[in-house]
């Protein structure tokens, strides 16, 4: 199963023209700098001012006057953005306030610029990359060599994984992390709930429940279900407070601990075990270990649901690209040994623990999640 053919011919053919290949290579050479150019345009408000100017556009001189940034500063950012297709030069340059021969003319927002400014998916990814990944990525080589998240040290030396650090991150970084984490899975919840509740489970275990969003969605969806959130102490503390504020303190319980720790005992009698964007936090070997612990705590009637964005099951190449990039976050920041998985390798790791794949659902939500339904093998 792990050798199944990928669904995009892009991964197999190399038909790109040499001149186009060179262009792409040159873009890669400057990506770190061009990324920061766009960040500067966003955080100074310059990109928004250009957008607000509409089809007539706005000159570098006007942008400088409005922002208090030198014409030089505005100019170098604008020229880079032109080269990236983020900005365009207005065809209505007779309206420009800067008539000097050296003027670029009026700048207008291009389609790429619109997505950087307005598209929530792009903004979440951009902020996550800048606030969580960018500085730590300089340690990617060491992370690859050592099998440890060497980039995490940019936030401090007290943690071995990012999950232990979450509650201690600065507010901006914490906000970017949680917005990234929630943005993807939250969009799939409306389609996931009918799948999980098809058999009307009474007891649901949410392993890796994080802030409790899924658990609270379950309580709203089914008035009779009880949910147990199993996660690290920092996360269960936050989830418990959120559950209390939502009025679900009597329907959501909490088990604090590391599921990989032999001393962490899972509760029993689950009708459903749910793991959303949780297993990608572990290596394949660790996934098998976690599922073995689950295997020993559930009976043959329990349904295991795993929701993950599998990069080889995405509808569009850009989504696969984003997931492949997210794998590098796991390598240098999160834990040093996990990634965003392919369908076959994830199924194989889970089945090694004694489960069989019963059913799979793909392309759920705007971000194309998969839900994999497993049950215990009759004869392990």
Indicate where each model-derived feature is located.
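Conserved Class I S-adenosyl-L-methionine-dependent methyltransferase catalytic core
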Residues: 9-16, 22-55, 65-66, 72-202
